Amino acid sequence: FDVDGDGWTDSAYTWPLWGIVIDPDGVSTKPEPINIKKESDPINSFALDVGIPLLRDGPISLDFYAQYASLLGKTTNPLDTTKRENVGYGLIPLGLSAKLGPAHFTFEFRMVPDGKFQFGYFNRSYEVERATFQSISGNQGTIITKASKLGRFGKQNGFFSGLNINLGSIFDVGFSYQNLKGEQFDPSKNEFEKADNQSFTAILKLAKPISKIDRASWFYQQRNVPNPFDFEYSESTITGYNASLKLGNGMVLTYIFRRTFQDFNGDGD
């Protein structure tokens, strides 16, 4: 054995009459591996929606809707990291969805009354954000989950808007933007302070097949940052494209590209 990983086997320092004695060279032993079963941090969500049609006139329509959305799980209190608290909920008391020919517009007033919540928690970048490994002292590490970071979000209010347009029955283009204002935890000051929480998503896709191209799409997403139009990459940034080509005889070749960014030290940058 070489439990401390220094290259010297423990057998060289073993006394048969007394059992195994770890080599006394002063080198600290390797840390215990992370047990993902003990370190699990489950989270779930559910939502309740209600909608009322307000207008129907040929290609024109207008609908009103409202939503209550809640996350189910625990998060860490940033003011006292030994405390675990229930995650929060979000409200959309006013939502409008309008269609005018090829254009579809949505507008929502959003509220997070008690913080510890994100709209669109399970988004495209969730697989990257859901767990980050952070190195700590003593040659050890810990797992920082996305759920544990929800505690840094305080009370917030703002709006969400989205626009989808069919361009000449060939392309579909979509944009969405969220702007929430409220409180976020600043670790450098160890307190909550006023901050902007903005998100932006853009999508361009082929509306119908063209020749050998069966499907094609491109997207860009950045969520929960002070200003997504600065285009400063974070873990919530993801971009990529999909392309499918018909090869004949029922075969389709699909190429998928994703570009993501990972926070190696868990500091949020």
Regions found by a protein language model. Give the residues of each.
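Signature for the C-terminal beta-barrel architecture of outer-membrane proteins
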Residues: 1-241, 260-267
